[in-house]
Amino acid sequence: VQLAHGVGEHAGRYAELIAALVADGYSVYADDHRGHGRTGMKQHGGDVSKLGRLGPGGMNATVAALWQFTQLIRDENPNLPLVLIGHSWGSFLSQMLLNDHPEAYDAVVLSGTALRWPGSMNGGDLNAPWKGKDSSGLEWLSRDPAVAQQFKDDPLTTEVPLLKLFGVIEAAKLFGRPRKHLGRD
């Protein structure tokens, strides 16, 4: 299983899922994407204020790095099926990978996703439905307040919105059309 996390977070936030999959006999690979988590801290010289920023090459370099990770997984496990799980921004990256390399994955699971067409993705305030005087701003993340608190307390996450992190040009690269005639079961 290859795991692609969402924007502003990191692979470590999926520790429970990874542990459950490993307990069921799966091998799990999860990286911190460019600008995120420990990768982001190293990339930005430990500057936590820059977490989430992709750096040189932007979105294209991020997708290329994720593809390189897929190839490493395939090289280490040539006879095993590969399932790609992408959440939120990771689901958009997964859609991009699937468009370019459909043969590389035996199955794909998209969570918290949308069609990558203008009008299908919400570029606005994801917390708008829960706005109120007592809202934390992270209600969109989970129905469990403890999950929002863990995110807020995690020094390797950022609440900076995607458009501010990436800028309009890089964020626009998330748009695309699904490739026709992808295999399906």
What annotation goes with each model-predicted range?
Residues 109-118:
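Active-site nucleophile loop of the alpha/beta-hydrolase fold
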Residues 5-9, 88:
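Active-site glycine-rich loops that stabilize anionic/oxyanionic intermediates
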Residues 51-75:
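Alpha/beta-hydrolase active-site loop
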Residues 11-13, 18-48:
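Conserved alpha/beta-hydrolase
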Residues 77-88:
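Alpha/beta-hydrolase fold nucleophile elbow
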Residues 91-102:
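Short glycine-enriched nucleophile-adjacent loop
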